């Protein structure tokens, strides 16, 4: 849907899946025409992730089940807008720092990708929201919150 609606569709990097698996999925879903837009490097090391996040126009993370979602925070902290699921623990972690969508609604996902692609002001706002959100998960903030808990316990 996104590829059909976009005048200049963004390429898609798919991490941790082999190209053969992706090709099989494309064939099964009868969408092989988008194969040239996909890049599947396989496993990506942690050392390479910041460069990939920084080079991305958006980070799409539509997991159906997630207990925390560290990649969301990694991407946001690199200044990459995030489109993610409105399910499981993701909304609690993402807060207003990411665009929440139904992970099964391809129209909603495509719509948000198009909006990020075509509306630079919206994209910059999402970057700002994401950077602000990550401050809540910094080591500094976590240590301050833990100190407050300890102080409240010792005062009792």
Pin down the residues of each PLM region.
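Short acidic/histidine- and often glycine-rich active-site loop of Leloir-type glycosyltransferases
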Residues: 72, 87-100
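Aromatic "clamp/platform" in nucleotide-sugar-dependent glycosyltransferases that forms part
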Residues: 64
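A short, well-ordered alpha-helix in the C-terminal region of glycosyltransferases
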Residues: 108, 122-136, 145-148, 152
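Nucleotide-activated donor-binding/catalytic signature segment of Leloir-type glycosyltransferases, i.e.
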Residues: 14-16, 24-50
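Short hydrophobic signal-anchor/transmembrane segments that target glycosyltransferases
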Residues: 1-9, 28-32
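Short hydrophobic beta-strand element within catalytic cores of glycosyltransferases
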Residues: 72, 77, 81-84
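Conserved acidic donor-binding segment of nucleotide-sugar-dependent glycosyltransferases
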Residues: 99-106, 115-120
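Short alpha-helical donor nucleotide-sugar binding micro-motif in glycosyltransferases
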Residues: 44, 51-56, 61, 109
């Amino acid at each position: 849907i996104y590829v059909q609606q976009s005048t200049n569709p963004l390429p898609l990097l798919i991490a941790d899946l082999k190209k053969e698996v992706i090709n099989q999925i494309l064939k099964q879903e009868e969408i092989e025409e988008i194969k040239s837009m996909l890049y599947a490097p396989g496993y990506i090391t942690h050392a390479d992730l910041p460069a990939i996040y920084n080079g991305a126009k958006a980070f799409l993370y539509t997991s159906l089940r997630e207990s925390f979602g560290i990649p969301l925070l990694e991407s946001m902290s690199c200044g990459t807008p995030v489109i993610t699921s409105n399910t499981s623990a993701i909304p609690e972690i993402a807060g207003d720092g990411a665009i929440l969508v139904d992970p099964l609604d391809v129209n909603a996902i495509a719509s948000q990708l198009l909006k990020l692609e075509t509306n630079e002001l919206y994209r910059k706002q999402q970057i700002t929201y994401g950077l602000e959100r990550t401050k809540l998960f910094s080591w500094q903030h976590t240590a301050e919150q833990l100190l407050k808990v300890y102080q409240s316990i010792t005062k009792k």
